[in-house]
Amino acid sequence: MHLKYRSFKLHKVVSEEHSKVQRAWSTMAGLPDNAWPLPLEFAPDERSKRRKGAHRPQFAKVWTQPGVTLSRPVAAHVFVNPYSGRKKGDVIAHEVCERLEQANVVTTVHRSNAPGHLVELAREADVPPGAVLLVVGGDGSLSEVITGRFERGSAADDVFGIVPGGTGNSQAHDLAIHSIDDAINTVLGGHVQSLDIGKVVLTEGLPGHEKEPIVRYSHNLVTWGLGVDSTIKAERMRWMGPLRYDVGIVMAILANQRRTAVLEMDGVRLEDDFTLLLIQNSQTGGSRLPLAPGASLDDGSMDIGILKSMTRRQIFRAFGMLKAEGRHVYHPRVDYHRFKTLTITTAKPTAINVDGENLGSTPLELTVLPRAVRLMVPP
């Protein structure tokens, strides 16, 4: 079914039964079963102060299922992005290896020498049972290692760990792993949760430099539209550190180019002009921005914030609300949904960002793989 966008502002709370609630409301509203689903809305956290005209939304639990505690790892294969975090990856990895060796954990280091190299290193690594694949870097580095293990066919049997060494470190932030100390204690604690993964099929290369289709496995986020434009601009200003994300967003807002796409979400089709699509597995992204307050890492679905076509003034307000603890979900031009499958097609190739890396272009196909990998987390 081909639809133009219709927005229905219904006051309901994000819950595990959201799909049943949506169907019930659709019936009451006289919509067909295959109509574009009604947007989810958030209950306000009335304990918070009102900012930007709204309370902070109630955030979902990061995990919906209990984890398990395994034996302490006997070995760690440490995958290092030396260029992450203002080129501090090697220094962080050296300290991590020293401290793990002191705890009688044998370490093997795999050092990347180019973007995408961690995929190859992870695919080729012989990791024995009882070892952890420990990633020193940011969200993109973890994505590369997970992708490499999927290509090897071993991802379901592996155990992954994170040492925050990138610029944003969104996944580590959501897991409360903020330092080397936190990462070491997490590894030695042996507590593991199962993490949803997004299987992303897209065209390699940014617009104008397209190659063949590739597959990447996303643990954090996928973005299309203004957000990708801003990160492309931000990558040219890496010397600015995290501030580059804010500068990039302002530059992209001022440009405010028109973006038309066809979305198909869980089999329902929609064509419209959009400002930004925020597709999230975790709650934060970029420089730890609260992009998806309703996201959980193991609920078998991913969340999407749809920022519809906006004026520059509306965009600035929406981003101000976003930075104010995720209040953008209350903006009248923002709708929030949850899905298991999603496609994005455009008349011309447009850029896609996966886990903080500008990897390719549309068309895009995304399928959620429920609880597909195991990740070490604080107890």
Where are these regions (language model features)?
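ATP/NTP phosphate-donor binding region
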Residues: 1-136, 143, 147-148
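ATP/nucleoside-binding phosphotransfer catalytic cores, i.e., glycine-rich phosphate-binding loops
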Residues: 25-30, 53, 59-63, 265, ...
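Short glycine-rich anion-binding loops that position phosphate/pyrophosphate groups of nucleotides
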Residues: 84, 138-141, 165-168, 224-226, ...
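Catalytic core of DAGKc-family lipid kinases
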Residues: 103, 112, 150-275
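Short glycine-/acidic-enriched loop or helix-start segments at secondary-structure transitions
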Residues: 144-147, 171-174, 288-289, 316, ...
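Glycine-rich phosphate/pyrophosphate-binding beta-alpha loops
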Residues: 223, 227, 278-293, 358
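Short acidic/glycine-rich loop or secondary-structure boundary segments that cap or lie
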Residues: 227-230, 271-273, 285-288, 312-315
